[in-house]
């Protein structure tokens, strides 16, 4: 991190319009995978005042009540009356999902599952850093925690005047690659019209900001921007149109690592935009957890219909205990990055995806979930179960 003395990342809440769209897309994916785990799904969502539109391509034997899924997601987030500007019970729902192209299917499907081709060409990145306990960059970690806490305070009634839409931004100061302070915090939260700015600022500072940001990182010159425009009453899909896939930096590393451009939500694991990015995080996190490097960024790339990656590249930014070339060899020896192998390695054919669609896909804690008769672990790409093998293979 020596190239930056300050670095800023942002996050958004589950009630942000783009995140509503992401959660709807992944809820549709989950419902289909729960019935047909080998389904091919690409679901896009648009939300605006009074309407939610879902579109895309699906190949499945399952039947799911798409309208009910869409409404439940919106209601669960907290948009349940015209007073907050959007109501999942009464909004219009339009479904224009079609079938997957047979040209794509013939390029992906194989008689031998392990030969499954990539669902599209593309490049994906994975990243890890030892600057936080979850091996993620601090600015995006704190940003996620702020909007998560906002949702907790809203839903629990701790701050009853909060509404679902919110955004956060955190600027961290670095010295020699380590976080030594937080220079600026921005938190904008939707609220009802009855709360005064004084009460809002005090409540947010005491029960959200100070609850999240470690006190030793705050200093006399830290800037706090709480609802800097004053009022934030109109929010959610009324304030802005929401679309699936528009928060790809929020979803990943907050700009600290590069991004191949592909979004995650609404895509089944045959789409390497999603599964290979998860695998990249898994590889990078295990490299850092093994002590092979303090920071690691990995890039993989694919050609449509081809199983083997077209490239695997790696950068430890001068923090590696071994050369990057030697670490790449360890990656090739210990991780199979073909699409089917990724799906198997990370056990991705379960309805786990709506949980990923807000507050970041990375830096989360692996958790056991049960949906119907299916019990599985979500966020498997956050496990560090390959670290010991990597350390041993490296001779450390």
Swiss-Prot record:
Cofactor requirement: Mg(2+); K(+)
Family: Belongs to the AdoMet synthase family.
Self-association and partners: Homotetramer; dimer of dimers.
Catalytic activity: L-methionine + ATP + H2O = S-adenosyl-L-methionine + phosphate + diphosphate
Gene Ontology molecular functions: ATP binding; magnesium ion binding; methionine adenosyltransferase activity
Entry's cofactor comment: Binds 2 divalent ions per subunit.
Residues involved in L-methionine binding: 57, 100, 240, 271
A cellular component annotation (GO) from this entry: cytoplasm
Biological processes, Gene Ontology terms: one-carbon metabolic process; S-adenosylmethionine biosynthetic process
Region (Flexible loop): 100-110
Keywords on record: ATP-binding, Cytoplasm, Magnesium, Metal-binding, Nucleotide-binding, One-carbon metabolism, Potassium, Transferase
Keyword Metal-binding: yes
EC number of this enzyme: 2.5.1.6
A Pfam family the protein falls into: S-AdoMet_synt_N
Gene behind the chain: metK
Entry protein name: S-adenosylmethionine synthase
Record organism: Pseudomonas syringae pv. syringae (strain B728a)
Keyword Coiled coil: no
Top EC class, one word: transferase
List of residues binding K(+): 44
Residues holding ATP: 16, 165-167, 240, 246-247, 263, 267
Subcellular location: Cytoplasm
Recorded metabolic or biological pathway in which this protein acts: Amino-acid biosynthesis; S-adenosyl-L-methionine biosynthesis; S-adenosyl-L-methionine from L-methionine: step 1/1
Residue positions binding Mg(2+): 18
Job of this protein: Catalyzes the formation of S-adenosylmethionine (AdoMet) from methionine and ATP. The overall synthetic reaction is composed of two sequential steps, AdoMet formation and the subsequent tripolyphosphate hydrolysis which occurs prior to release of AdoMet from the enzyme.
